[in-house]
Design a protein with these regions (language model features):
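C-terminal tail/sorting-segment detector
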Residues: 5, 391, 396, 405-435
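Beta-propeller fold detector
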Residues: 25-28, 68-76, 125-141, 187-194, ...
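Beta-rich, blade/repeat-based domains predominating
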Residues: 30-42, 56, 77-99, 136-166, ...
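Residue position within the beta-strands of beta-propeller blades
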Residues: 46-49, 101-103, 168-169, 222-224, ...
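Short, solvent-exposed loop/turn segments at conserved positions within beta-propeller repeat blades
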Residues: 51-56, 108-113, 171-172, 230-235, ...
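A short loop-to-beta-strand structural motif that recurs across blades of beta-propeller domains
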Residues: 55-61, 113-116, 175-178, 236-239, ...
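Short loop/turn segments that connect beta-strands within beta-propeller blades
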Residues: 62-67, 118-123, 180-184, 241-246, ...
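Surface-exposed, proline-anchored Ser/Thr-rich loop/turn motifs
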Residues: 344-372, 382-387, 414, 431-435
Length: 435
């Protein structure tokens, strides 16, 4: 894949504040570009975060009371301004014996494109977050990939098979790479070829980008995929990959699948669709609240079981059938009620638009909102990484049309931001540009 996945979305997307029903509850906040969520042997979620581009990638454990415990910090995190991409850690697996494996994505650091091994015992003994220098071992995945005919490497996820070998999904090489631990040897298990672009928009061929790899109960593996630009609806597949590399389509008709897991209630596969791509404001981008959870039958049938959230790249099921989901742009970890076949759709809670004048501006502007009833109004301003820049009280406003003057000229830099106003059960969102 010529462009790293996810982080172009940070720059190109007009994102807004998500509203939650009783079925979706945020349980952790202020996460730094959360990608993956993985559960340990106790069912506790661990969240892999790509950071902000300042070598601040990290892995945190989210305790039942919502507190975050930083286990590993200071991992390579780099923002490429030319490509508009954030590059950092992408996934983590926590083993029952205390080993912690972190999959580090693409980037310029010497530890980019590797899988690093840490250990829980070292964290306990240190009494402080581990750093890269505390690692016990390194799988130099990217070095081998780049030396063996591939232009790029971006290890996204991995699994460890029954023999202790690693199957690595590379989202830039568009291949599954096998690492034999005992022999210290790499090999290509399978590659995913591009297909002809059926539209006049974008490049002549669309890349097939592998994301999550899972073991299939009957042997072999399942590999989810997303497609490159123009991010076509229904063009993503889940593939069945046998141990000899034989590859076939397991399920089709999906869109931008970034993760998948097994539903513990019925044993069926559930795929996470990151978001849909379409018209946003005056341009095309990834549509807020358009992520979906899709139940995938063994026969390939698809059934939507949750919708109206995200963009969300990471999924993990708890033992009771509730799902943990990362929200990339709001920097949150969500948890659902135990899922069943009825669709949980949050579409009716979509935020309302509001008008800002002037826009662009110097940080001083007026926004107009219409309130159904008198209520207290608060504001929240976030940057393009979803980080909170400013919050405050607007005050008690009457029902009807209201002009709300705001002034961020003294404490906010130039650039594009997301402004959200909360008025009780009503939410208003817009994009503002400070020049």
């Amino acid at each position: 894949m010529k462009r790293r996945i996810y982080i172009p979305f940070l720059i190109s997307m007009l994102f807004s504040l998500l509203l939650f029903s009783q079925n979706f509850t945020p349980i952790a906040f202020d996460l730094a570009a959360p990608i993956d969520v993985n559960l340990d042997a106790n069912g506790t979620p661990w969240v892999t975060q790509s950071g902000s581009g300042a070598n601040d990638g990290l892995v945190q454990k989210v305790n039942p009371d919502g507190t975050k415990e930083t286990i590993i910090e200071g991992l390579p995190s780099y923002f490429d301004f030319m490509l508009e991409e954030l590059q950092g850690p992408l996934s983590t697996q926590v083993m029952a014996d205390g080993r912690i494996f972190v999959c580090q994505g693409a980037g310029p650091d010497s530890l980019s494109q590797t899988i690093m091994e840490f250990h829980w015992d070292d964290y306990v003994a240190k009494g402080a977050p581990l750093v890269a220098a505390d690692r016990r071992g390194t799988i130099w995945h990217g070095q081998w990939v780049l030396a063996n005919g591939f232009d790029e490497s971006n290890p996204y996820s991995f699994l460890i098979d029954g023999d202790g070998n690693f199957l690595i999904s590379d989202a830039a090489a568009n291949a599954i790479i096998k690492y034999n631990v005992n022999a210290d040897e790499f090999s290509v298990l399978t590659e995913f070829p591009s297909f002809q672009n059926p539209t006049p928009i974008g490049p002549p061929f669309v890349q097939v980008v592998p994301t999550k790899i899972l073991a299939h109960p009957d042997g072999g593996y399942l590999v989810s995929s997303l497609t490159g630009f123009p991010f076509l609806d229904g063009a993503s597949n889940i593939y069945r990959v046998q141990k000899d590399g034989t590859t076939s389509v397991y399920a089709s008709g999906l869109t931008l699948v970034t993760d998948m897991d097994w539903d513990p209630n019925d044993g069926e596969l559930v795929a996470l669709q990151f978001a849909a791509f379409g018209p946003v404001d005056t341009s095309f981008s990834f549509i807020f609240n358009s992520a979906q959870l899709i139940k995938v039958a063994e026969t390939g049938g698809l059934d939507t079981i949750a919708a109206g959230f995200g963009p969300s790249p990471g999924l993990a099921f708890a033992a009771d059938g509730s799902a943990y989901l990362t929200h990339l742009f709001l920097g949150q970890l969500l948890k659902t009620d135990p899922l069943s076949t009825p669709v949980f759709d949050l579409g009716k809670w979509q935020p309302k638009p509001m008008v800002v004048f002037p826009n662009p501006n110097d940080g001083r502007f007026t926004t107009n909102i219409f309130l159904e009833k008198p209520t207290e109004v608060t504001y929240r301003l976030t940057d393009l990484l979803g980080r909170e820049v400013a919050t405050g009280q607007v005050g008690h406003l009457p029902a009807g049309e209201n002009a709300v003057p705001l002034d961020f000229s003294n404490n906010v830099g130039h650039g594009a931001y997301q402004l959200s106003l909360n008025a009780g059960s009503e939410w208003f969102v817009t994009k503002v540009i400070f020049k």
